[in-house]
Amino acid sequence: MTATKQHKKVILVGDGAVGSSYAFALVTQNIAQELGIIDIFKEKTQGDAEDLSHALAFTSPKKIYAADYSDCHDADLVVLTAGAPQKPGETRLDLVEKNLRINKEVVTQIVASGFKGIFLVAANPVDVLTYSTWKFSGFPKERVIGSGTSLDSARFRQALAAKIGVDARSVHAYIMGEHGDSEFAVWSHANVAGVGLYDWLQANRDIDEQGLVDLFISVRDAAYSIINKKGATFYGIAVALARITKAILDDENAVLPLSVFQEGQYEGVEDCYIGQPAIVGAYGIVRPVNIPLNDAELQKMQASANQLKAIIDEAFAKEEFASAAKN
């Protein structure tokens, strides 16, 4: 996609709870001029396209339709939400093999269409499926992006903001690592309007050390809490995807926490996608933003990456996945 292109086209693959919520976010936030939706349940997809189109008189003109894979050929962005949902009691990593098969089938058909844009992956386990999208597509690593820890970081900022009594937009803090159980908070660089978090807390006494531990656990386990109550999470990730989409289509060079390919940014972390901040624009990842981690944080990053690598290596040792790899 050229940064000056006026007509911006998004194809969404997967019209489940996350996908349809994302489509709704694009419509209400006036993002993109064309939205095609692909799903195996074609009648439901046609219904969603019609329903979303009825909101356009309140927003802005947009072409919305039930698409097929041939429509990907001139898209700027393809967003992948298709996959088996996470069930109560199931971790994101439990989903690996069944969603890898779906991912392989979907990515192969998208590439066959002649697609030359950017992949944005949200299906879980997102770090593993972003890696597999890169492998199956043969695309440059900069043009394959995962939603990563974007939602986790938003949850973290919101939880901190609620505890200390400020707007979440004034809290600057990141969750890094796997989007899942091995993620970690980068406490060493968290700040409120430029004031280091620990300095802020020392001056204001809003929360003690155990309170911070409990806050992080609530952030890390938020998805499990929501899944147990309503069966799935979709609104938060949908808005996170819309934010990433806007940054790409508008060539914002925004810094967002995403699944980013690792090639030595952090010692001992290579050949995997994992959550870290990165600059993102019209051509995908411009460059990662390598927050200097303290020793404890680096160890957590390495442990998280090692867990992901073990799963990736096991999966791609199987002929059905290894034979489809192009990278």
From Swiss-Prot:
Beta-D-fructose 1,6-bisphosphate binds at residues 157, 172. InterPro entries: L-lactate/malate_DH, L-lactate_DH, L-lactate_DH_AS, Lactate/malate_DH_C, Lactate/malate_DH_N, Lactate_DH/Glyco_Ohase_4_C, NAD(P)-bd_dom_sf. Transmembrane segments: none annotated. Pathway: Fermentation; pyruvate fermentation to lactate; (S)-lactate from pyruvate: step 1/1. One of its GO terms (molecular function) is L-lactate dehydrogenase activity. It catalyses: (S)-lactate + NAD(+) = pyruvate + NADH + H(+). Allosterically activated by fructose 1,6-bisphosphate (FBP). The keyword Chaperone does not apply. GO terms for biological process: glycolytic process; lactate metabolic process. The modification Phosphotyrosine is found at residue 224. It is an enzyme of class 1 (oxidoreductase). NAD(+) binds at residues 18, 39, 44, 69, 83-84, 122-124, 147. The keyword NAD applies. Substrate binds at residues 86, 92, 124-127, 152-155, 233. It is found in: Cytoplasm. Keywords: Allosteric enzyme, Cytoplasm, NAD, Oxidoreductase, Phosphoprotein. The active site is at 179 (proton acceptor). Belongs to the LDH/MDH superfamily. LDH family. Catalyzes the conversion of lactate to pyruvate. This is L-lactate dehydrogenase.
